Amino acid sequence: MNNTALKNEKKPRTPVAIIGIGCRFPGNADSPESFWKMLCSGVDAISEVPQDRWNSQAFYSPDIGKPGFMPIHQGGFLSNIDLFDADFFGISPREAAYIDPQQRLLLEVVWEALENGGLVPANLVGSRTGVFIGKFAMEYHLMQFSEMQRELIGPHSSTGTLGTLLSNRISHWFDFQGPSIALDTACSSSLVAVHLACQSLWSGESDLALAGGVNIIFKPEWTLA
């Protein structure tokens, strides 16, 4: 075997252990256990579009391709996306109102994932923990920065709605010192986040990595598209 072959030979990688999980899925599956139970029971978590998202009947038409309308009025929706324990995270009610529910949700789920893995967040302060979050729709940002509603813009609008903060707020709040990346590769975003987390662990860049994804649709436009 020549030197070139030796260089090109792939070295075996240390297996990556998944030690904790946190989640939110339609059908009130708010933990790994409830999600597994839902799958085993064959529960259909698809429901009518909630009224607090949009009036589905106003946009419904069986005529596929009709501009401004959609041939569906159902989907997979999370419950209580407006609820957030701001006091727990030391965030004022005023600032919390500007924060994208996707950011709020990620803070809660990260805490739950660490607990699920038997990790104490205080013990991870300053650690080389990487955060990799897949994203897609950023509608809360569009809603606040609308030309028609500039009065909604406030002192926390940027940090509350920018996509990069989906990962950065986690790293900042928990004081993680590893890489902090929010990425968008459409439907593969969460999978790519896991891939990058593994690469970070294998390279020695991170000692611990959090990988996940979030996508909350507030308005009908993305479904229309």
Predicted regions and their residues:
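Cys-dependent condensing catalytic cores that perform Claisen condensation/acyl-transfer
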Residues: A5-A225
